[in-house]
Design a protein with these regions (language model features):
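A short coil-to-beta-strand element that immediately follows conserved catalytic motifs
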Residues: 58-68
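Conserved Nudix-box catalytic region and its N-terminal flanking loop in Nudix hydrolases
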Residues: 14-54
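Short secondary-structure boundary/capping segments
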Residues: 7-8, 23-24, 73-77, 94-99
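Active-site-adjacent beta-strand/loop module that shapes the phosphate/pyrophosphate-binding cleft
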Residues: 69-94, 106, 111-112
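NUDIX/MutT-family hydrolases
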Residues: 86, 96-127
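A structural signal for short, well-ordered beta-strand segments
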Residues: 7, 65, 84-85
């Protein structure tokens, strides 16, 4: 099973989501969270730091694991375990898109994020609700 880390950046009662670009075969144009694959031998926390630097130009400073999701559609993305993290302090200023994995990033209230029609995974909602 592949491991993927995902970060729910928090700013007050808002959470940062990233719209995946139209390029990937898995969940194109869907709202998700910054993150990515854990490399062989890499600790989850180290992967989270690396992925946030690569995708949105930030270094997480205060974060904790808030849950896990097993990929609900293995035919789309393979056997994946998502490690979900909450992040409430970071260095590097404002998040910005780095690279071409995302077409947009935006802050949403947690309630609005739960109601989005185009979330990559419906399983994000129960984890988002833990943040309320």
């Amino acid at each position: 099973m592949k491991d993927i880390v995902k970060a729910m950046l928090l700013r007050g009662t808002n959470v940062l989501l990233a719209r995946r670009s139209s390029r990937p075969r898995n969940y194109p144009d869907r709202w998700s969270f910054p993150g990515g694959h854990v490399e062989t031998g890499e600790a989850l926390d180290d992967a989270l730091v690396r992925e946030l630097q690569e995708e949105i130009g930030l270094t997480p400073l205060v974060f904790w694991k808030i849950g896990e999701i097993i990929e609900p559609n293995p035919s789309i993305n393979g056997d994946v375990l998502y490690h979900m993290y909450a992040v409430n302090a970071w260095a590097g200023g404002k998040p910005s898109i780095v690279g071409d994995e995302h077409s947009e990033i935006r802050w949403f209230s947690i309630h609005a994020a739960c109601a989005l029609q185009h979330l990559a995974l419906a399983e994000y909602v129960p984890i988002l609700r833990k943040l309320l």
